[in-house]
Amino acid sequence: MPRQISDIKQFLEIARRKDATSARIKKNTNKDVKFKLRCSKYLYTLVVADAKKAEKLRQSLPPDLTVTEVGKKA
């Protein structure tokens, strides 16, 4: 089931949980970056409009989390 999160700190807390298995980063054409975090019960989504904040958030994800980048189709 999907859940949308608006707070970056809350997203990072969920990413550090034991049931967080993978994260997908999707960059849209309108400069939005979506972070999708797969946990056992929910798929959490965070939308970041600022590219610099998105890069900092990507670097602060836990290293044991599998991160996949999904870009625009060519």
From Swiss-Prot:
One of the Pfam families matching this protein, by short name: Ribosomal_L38e
Gene Ontology annotations of biological process type: cytoplasmic translation; protein-RNA complex assembly
Coiled-coil intervals: none
Keyword Ribonucleoprotein: yes
Main subcellular location: cytoplasm
Gene3D superfamilies the record matches: 3.30.720.90
Keywords of this entry: Cytoplasm, Ribonucleoprotein, Ribosomal protein
GO MF terms, alphabetically ordered: structural constituent of ribosome
Gene Ontology CC: cytosol; cytosolic large ribosomal subunit; preribosome
InterPro entries to which the protein is assigned, alphabetical: Ribosomal_eL38, Ribosomal_eL38_sf
Annotated localization: Cytoplasm
Superkingdom in the source lineage: Eukaryota
Oligomer and partners: Component of the large ribosomal subunit (LSU). Mature yeast ribosomes consist of a small (40S) and a large (60S) subunit. The 40S small subunit contains 1 molecule of ribosomal RNA (18S rRNA) and at least 33 different proteins. The large 60S subunit contains 3 rRNA molecules (25S, 5.8S and 5S rRNA) and at least 46 different proteins.
PANTHER family: 60S RIBOSOMAL PROTEIN L38 (PTHR10965), LARGE RIBOSOMAL SUBUNIT PROTEIN EL38 (PTHR10965:SF0)
Family classification: Belongs to the eukaryotic ribosomal protein eL38 family.
Task of the protein: Component of the ribosome, a large ribonucleoprotein complex responsible for the synthesis of proteins in the cell. The small ribosomal subunit (SSU) binds messenger RNAs (mRNAs) and translates the encoded message by selecting cognate aminoacyl-transfer RNA (tRNA) molecules. The large subunit (LSU) contains the ribosomal catalytic site termed the peptidyl transferase center (PTC), which catalyzes the formation of peptide bonds, thereby polymerizing the amino acids delivered by tRNAs into a polypeptide chain.
Miscellaneous section: There are 2 genes for eL38 in S.pombe.
Name of this chain's protein: Large ribosomal subunit protein eL38A
Gene it is expressed from: rpl3801
